[in-house]
Amino acid sequence: MIIRLHFYYLLTLVYHLGLVGAYEKAARKRIQPPDLIPGPPGHKLGDERPPHYDHRPPYKKHIDNIPAYNLTDLIDDKLLNKYENSCTVNVLTGGFISLASNSWHLRAYNYTLNYPSFLIRCDNGSANPNFSHVLQDFVYDINNKFNVQDDSSKYIGKDPFPLGMIMITFASGCICVATWMLFLVVLLLPSDNHNRRNKVVHVYVLFSAIIRTVFLNETIAVIFDSQYHDDYQDASQFESFIVETAPYKICELVANILSDINWIYIVHYLQSNYGKPTWNWIPFKMKKGTHIIITVGCFLSLADNILFANLLWRKNLVVLKVFYKLIELLIYTIFISIICYFTWHNFAYILLPKTAEINTDGKCKTKLRILWENYHETIPLLAYNILIFILFYFTTIFFAAFTKHVRGWTFNFVHLLKVLITVNVWGLIGVLEKRELHISKKTVLGRKINNRDKFFANPTVNYYGEDLGKHLSAITLNRDLNTTKSNTTSHDSSSLVGSPSPTWKSPIERIRDRRRRHKIMKSENKFGQNPSFGSKSNGKPNTKTTLSKYRQLLRKPRRKTNSYEPKNGIGQNKEGSTVRPGADKHIRDSNYLATDISDNESMETELRTNHIYNYENSD
C-alpha cells in the first residue's frame, strides 16, 4: 500500500494547536530544488528507544535506492529527538476523524482518511510555547526544501496482500466450504457407488471438514477479529496462535495417516480384481499380492508420517524438509502409476476406439457420432483426473520451494487436493466398472453376434458333431462373401433387442420336453409289459430298445443342430430310424430360417436365463 502524507490534515492539526488560518493552507507539490545536495539527517547513534508512532512490530519492505530523505527520519530528527518530552507521533489508519479547537468549542472539522496518516501532537502547556511555529516550519520544510521518500509503510503494521490475514482467512474459508461440499457429494451418491460404500472415505472426508471448520472459527475469533478492529494485519500471529499449537499439529498428522490408509485400500481393491478386499492380518496367511501391498504401503506410510511429525515440531531443519518432500512425491508417484496401470490393464478394451464397430460407409460424421456416444462420459472424466494429478505435483513442489515460515498455511491446498484425489479415484473406478458392465451386456447377452468380432467363435468350427461341422464348413465356403453385408453397427444391434426365434428353447421348455418324454417312456414300458402284446421273449428286446432310446433322450441335451442343417442331413438316421412327425415339422421350419443366414452373422446367442432384457432401457 502506498503511504503518503496528508499535509492538509497536518495543517489542520497545527491549527488545532493555536495557529489561526493555518487550515486554509493547501499542501503543495514537492519540488526538488536544483541546488540542493541531499544528505542524511542527523541521527543519534545508540538511540534504542522505540518511536511513539510504532504501535506494531516493524516490517521490512524493499525500497528503491533513491537519494532522498526518509519521512520517518525527518520526523525523528526534527521533532522527536529535540522535543521527546513534549511531542508524540501516532499513526492514524483509514477511517473517520473529527477535530475540534480548544478555543472554539462549537466548531468541529470532520474528515475521512482513506490512507494511513501521521498525527503529530505537541503540548502547548509546556515551558516552550512555540510548538505551533515549530510545526509550521516543519511542514514548510518537507514541502519545499526536501525530497521526501515515504518509508512509513514499515510502521503501519500491515503485511503484503498475499501474506495478509484477509488472504489467509479467505483461503481457509474456501478450503472449508470445498471439503464440506465433497462430504455432501459423498453422502448423496447412489448406494452402489464406492464412495458411498467405503466408510474409510467417509471418515477421512468428514474429519478433514471438521478440523478445517474448527480452526477457521478459531482464526476468525482470536486473530482476524482483533486485527480488523485495530486495522492492521500480522500473519505471524496466525502462525503462533494457530499453526504452532499442539491440537493443530495432531489433527494434521491424523489427516495424513487417514490419507495413506485410503490410498493403500484403493491399491488393494484394484489388485483384488475389483472384488471386496479380504483383510487377513496374519502375515503368513496373506496372499502374495496383498502381502506386498500391505508391506510396502505400511513402510512408506510409516516413513512419511514420522518425517511429517518431526517437521511439524521442528520446522527449521532444511534436510528434514527435503527428505519429507521426496518421500511424499515418491508415494504419490507410485500411487498414480498403479492407478494408471490397473486402469489400462482392466479397462483398455473399453477405452480403445477399435472396440467400437464403425459403419461401413466410412464417413467421418458417423465415426465421430459413434465415438461421442461411447466416450462422452469417460474422456472428460479421465481429463479431469489427469488435471488434478498434475495440479497436485505442481502445488507440492511450488509451495515447498517458495514457501517460507509465515506461509505454511498454503499447504492446506495440498491437503485439500489429497482429499479430492481420493474421492475422484473411487469415482473413476466406479464409472469404468459401470461402463464395463454396460458394454458386456450390449456385446454378449441377447443380441446377434457378428462373427467378425475377434471375441467370438468362428462358425465354421465343428462344435456339436463331426457331420454337422463338415456340413457347415461346406455351406460357408461355397457362399459368396460379398453377396450379403451387415448394414447395422454394434450400437444399432444392441439398442434393437428383438424376441428370440422359434428355434430357440428356454430351459423351462426343455424341462417340459423332458417330462413329456418321461411320460411317453413310462407308457411304452407299461405297453411292453402287457401280456396281450405278445410273449415275454418277444417283448423283452423291444422293451430294452425303448428304454435305451429314451435314456438317451433324458440326458442333458446339447444344442440341437436341426436349426442350421438341411432336412436331408438330419431327417435320416444312420440306422434307418424314422423321425417323429412333430420333429419333422420343426426341422422344416428350421431349414426355412437357415436359408436367410449371412456368413458374417450368426444366430442369436443362447442365454442362461429365461428372458432377453432390453438393457438400453434397464439402465
UniProtKB/Swiss-Prot annotation:
Instruction: Tell me which UniProt keywords the record has, alphabetically.
Output: Membrane, Transmembrane, Transmembrane helix, Zinc
Q: What is its main location?
A: membrane
- Keyword Zinc, does the record have it? yes
Q: Which residues form a coiled coil?
A: none
The residues exposed to the Cytoplasmic compartment are 23-167, 225-291, 343-378, 432-619
- Locate the compositionally biased regions of type Basic and acidic residues: 44-54
Q: Write out the ranges of the annotated region (Disordered).
A: 33-54, 485-506, 520-586
Q: Does the keyword Membrane apply?
A: yes
* TM segment ranges: 2-22, 168-188, 204-224, 292-312, 322-342, 379-399, 411-431
Where does the record place Polar residues bias? 485-504, 526-549
Biological process (GO) annotations held by this record are: cellular response to pH; protein processing; pseudohyphal growth
Ranges of biased composition (kind: Basic residues): 552-561
Factors inducing expression = Repressed by zinc.
**A Gene Ontology term for the protein's cellular component:** plasma membrane
Q: Where in the cell is it found?
A: Membrane
| A Pfam family that the UniProt record links to this protein | PalH
Residues in the Extracellular compartment per record: 1, 189-203, 313-321, 400-410
Specify the protein's topology with respect to the membrane: Multi-pass membrane protein
Database matches in PANTHER family: PH-RESPONSE REGULATOR PROTEIN PALH/RIM21, PROTEIN DFG16
Protein function: Involved in invasion during filamentous growth.
Protein's name in the database: Protein DFG16
Q: Corresponding gene?
A: DFG16
